[in-house]
């Protein structure tokens, strides 16, 4: 049996852009040929694509690092470097992608073929042909390629099912799924026979169809991790209707009503929204002795908890083993699904700010200035650091261009206001230079 994995932590890194080239046209009969260095190619992006054929996150168990290729360097004759191909990473339907640092949801991938650029490749550096001006017709300036985005991610798979079967172990969930669909879950006369979610397609006699999931049995304390705990409670979150399966024969020696209350408490503790979903009570094993009497007692206790009869959940007595009462249950489930909307899985507070995450939002500050214990002024900030890494520090003209960019951003003036003096050390990343006033 293939292993089921529904969570994974991975890192993704997009490719770096290729460096621009400094080159000059030197041909016979072409005086003053001018700059001829081309741009670097763009780095490859990391793209997640949904594949309906995948059922688990098992592929990410041993392969946790995904790195796209970098773009090629620019060439002479003004030719651009080749851009790198994007790296496509396939994920199953129902995969939620979170930022590992903040826990915020980046995207919920639910449609087959759906794609998202999860880490954008760096743009290629410009060659010196781009920097020619009337004042400087032969520039010795070219940019380094921009680094690709790098992210730490958490993947969480929540299977796509319209209906979820919940209940204590050995109440007959797997048997029910096996007789109403073509699914073949493992069935046994012991607890936790089902240790992975099973999914089956159900078709009613009236022609309606829906996906039903058999989830591993819950026990008291599951929401705190007891038994299989929260490992599989997450799979209930996408369902629109819950079928609460109860062993009405009390063959395990437990009271059916106490089972019902206990499981609902676990659902509510795990996620308050789960109790917003409509729930049908499936009174299973009605072909067993004591089941009828237990059902009467169950209904009496249940009614005592409701003020109005209309509020009572629907109860369907069935026997999965004897194939009794199944048609009525499935028809009622289909009708309930037809009038039940999708439930929002996440609040806005759970989601990343897309503009900020993907770099579209304008920040108030382009840079920050701090001072180390050794009296070195430290410059930081996303825009400033990006300009720095794209500057070729081996060429004087590139360094002078970077200095002009810093002045244009107001860095020099800000350093003076903070008290920087001529000759003070200034650091950007690992590069250190002296402040010139």
From Swiss-Prot:
Mg(2+) binds at residues 174, 194. InterPro entries: G_OBG, GTP-bd, GTP-bd_Obg/CgtA, GTP-bd_prot_GTP1/OBG_C_sf, GTP1-OBG_CS, GTP1_OBG_dom, GTP1_OBG_dom_sf, OBG_GTPase. Its cofactor is Mg(2+). The keyword Hydrolase applies. It is an enzyme of class 3 (hydrolase). GO terms for molecular function: GTP binding; GTPase activity; magnesium ion binding. It is found in: Cytoplasm. Its main location: cytoplasm. Its EC number is 3.6.5.-. One of its GO terms (biological process) is ribosome biogenesis. Keywords: Cytoplasm, GTP-binding, Hydrolase, Magnesium, Metal-binding, Nucleotide-binding. Pfam families: DUF1967, GTP1_OBG, MMR_HSR1. Residues 2-160 form the Obg domain. Residues 359-437 form the OCT domain. Coiled coil: none annotated. GTP binds at residues 167-174, 192-196, 214-217, 284-287, 319-321. Residues 161-338 form the OBG-type G domain. The keyword Hydrolase applies. GO terms for cellular component: cytoplasm. HAMAP family: GTPase_Obg. Belongs to the TRAFAC class OBG-HflX-like GTPase superfamily. OBG GTPase family. An essential GTPase which binds GTP, GDP and possibly (p)ppGpp with moderate affinity, with high nucleotide exchange rates and a fairly low GTP hydrolysis rate. Plays a role in control of the cell cycle, stress response, ribosome biogenesis and in those bacteria that undergo differentiation, in morphogenesis control. Monomer. This is GTPase Obg. The gene is obg.
